[in-house]
């Protein structure tokens, strides 16, 4: 019986040390952060847990999660570049965000015109879309996109479903055509 109790206490101690840190889908590998500014990163950990955030460009921040486990930090970002960066978020366990770029972030939102992907819909093809998709790997290090799933809400949301994507032949067909042509033009103008 003593061995069983000792084992249970040991397992409880291991579980408490292995606290989980979670992030919303909008904060992840392959994301782009706005250059030369203070960006907010947030997530969830155990209630009242210490959270440390460190970026490969030298920025660091720490916070303590609130009673519901939510935390938020602000990081200073450097000038934009195409050099991939890394962000580590730690609170018990560790989340590593790889292949993060620093540059220009633009939100493209709307209805059917904005939603039309480069791959087109059914009979609706995008002029030049197939060529862009075929050559998309050339833009892999320059353009990223986050396709947020359809949803609605009447209050601000901390979590929205979606994931950051590099612009590649495998992902380009899902990217908004309008957003792509804007990003490509902006990339040429700013370089």
Regions found by a protein language model. Name each.
Residues 4-13:
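Sec-dependent N-terminal signal peptides
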Residues 14-18:
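C-terminal segment of classical bacterial N-terminal signal peptides
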Residues 19-191:
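Cell-envelope and extracellular/periplasmic
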């Amino acid at each position: 019986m003593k061995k069983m109790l000792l084992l249970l206490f040991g397992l409880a101690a291991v579980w408490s040390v292995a606290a989980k840190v979670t992030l919303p889908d909008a904060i992840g590998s392959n994301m782009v952060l706005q250059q030369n500014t203070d960006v907010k990163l947030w997530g969830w950990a155990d209630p009242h847990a210490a959270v440390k955030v460190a970026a490969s460009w030298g920025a660091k921040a720490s916070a303590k999660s609130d009673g519901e486990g939510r935390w938020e930090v602000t990081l200073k970002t450097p000038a934009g570049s195409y050099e991939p960066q890394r962000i580590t978020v730690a609170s018990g366990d560790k989340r590593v965000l790889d292949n993060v770029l620093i540059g220009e972030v633009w939100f493209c939102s709307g209805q059917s015109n904005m939603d039309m992907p480069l791959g087109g819909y059914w009979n609706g093809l995008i002029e030049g879309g197939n060529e862009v998709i075929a050559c998309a790997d050339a833009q892999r290090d320059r353009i990223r996109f986050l396709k947020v799933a359809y949803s609605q809400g009447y209050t601000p949301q901390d979590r929205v479903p979606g994931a950051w994507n590099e612009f590649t032949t495998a992902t380009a067909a899902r990217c908004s055509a309008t957003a792509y042509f804007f990003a490509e033009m902006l990339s040429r103008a700013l370089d």
